[in-house]
C-alpha cells in the first residue's frame, strides 16, 4: 500500500473492499520489476486482507504424504511428540518452516519448547521490542513464576499460556472481556486505537475505563490491578496475532515431525525442484 512518497510492499493475499480495485490500483517500478500497488492507505479503502501461506511448503508436505500414506496426513499427526520438540531445541532446523533462522535457534535451545503453544510463543516473541522480554519469559518458565494475580484466577488462566506476559493481541481482548467486562468488539476497537496512536492519548483514555471495569468485574486488589495495567501499557504496542503465530507453528511442527520420523522422505521432498 502507498501513501504520499512512501510505500510498503505486503505479502500477496485477498483484499476485500467495497470499490473496484481496478479504480484504485497503480503500477510501481522498482529493481527492474513491476508491482501492482494500492495507492491509498489500507484503512481508506478496505476492511480485510487475508494473506496466503507459502504454497511450496504445503506442496512438499503433500509429496511426503504421497509416499508414506494418508495415515500420516498432517491433520492426523499427534501434536505432543517429545522427539519433535527435542528437534526444535537441538537446532537441527534446516527446512523447518519459519524456524530455521540462525538467530532463532539459540532462543529455542534456551526455551526448550515442550508444546505447540511454546513454539507459538517463541515465534511471536521473535520480533523487535518483544525480544526484550525473552529473558523474562525464560525465567518465568523455568522458575515456576505462577504468581499471575492470585486473587482472580481468571487472569492466571488467560496469562498462563504466555508465562505471565502479554504476547498476543487476542490475550488483550480476553483480559478486557473477562476481567474488565468490556465486549470483544469494544476491546478490539481499543486495541486498534492504542496501537495506532503515537502520542499515548488513547492509552491514557483507556486506563481509567479499564480500571473501572476491573473494580466492577474482578476480584483483583489495587496492587494487582496496577500491575496488570502496567503490563498492558508496556506491552500492548508489541503484541502479535496468535492466529498467525499458532498456525505457522503448527506447519513448522508438521515439518519437524516428518524430519524426525521420515527423514529420507523429508529430505527428498525438500530438495526437489519439482514444486
Protein language model features and the residues they cover:
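Noncatalytic, beta-rich nucleic-acid-contacting surfaces in large DNA/RNA-processing enzymes
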Residues: 1-275
